[in-house]
Amino acid sequence: MGEKTGKFLWIDLTVPEAEQIRDFYSAVVGWTWDPVSVDDYEDYNIKTPGGELVAGICHRRGVNNNLPPAWINYVIVESVGASLDACVSKGGKIIDGPRKQQEDVFVIIQDPAGAYIGLYGKE
């Protein structure tokens, strides 16, 4: 990951009714969207009015059932395993994962103040 370590990579929102929230943000900030097939339903990639891919809005179902209804920013880390060890030793909690995504893994943690963040990188 090198020079990208510590940078924000992606933002996801996981909610019970993704279509309703997708339409809300489309009206409020002008986002457009593309469907992403997941099992027997669709989640959504969110784009700016100019077409730049910026976020995801996901259903709180299946593997995402335990995720909080919050915007979660994902940060690139060198080693998800080492970051998880540091998280727990400093009073944080592992909320979900680690989960595999292509060659990398991601995990959602909660810091000691209660805020959520995602970590993305090599195992």
Where are these regions (language model features)?
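Short glycine-enriched loop/turn motifs at secondary-structure junctions
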Residues: 4-6, 65-70, 101
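Short, structured motif recognition centered on aromatic/hydrophobic residues
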Residues: 8-12, 70-74, 117
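A short acidic/small-residue loop/turn micro-motif
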Residues: 102, 122-123
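Core segments of cupin and vicinal oxygen chelate
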Residues: 2-52, 89, 105
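Conserved short beta-strand elements that form part of the metal-binding/catalytic scaffold
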Residues: 31-68, 112, 116-122
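Vicinal oxygen chelate
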Residues: 18, 49-52, 73-113
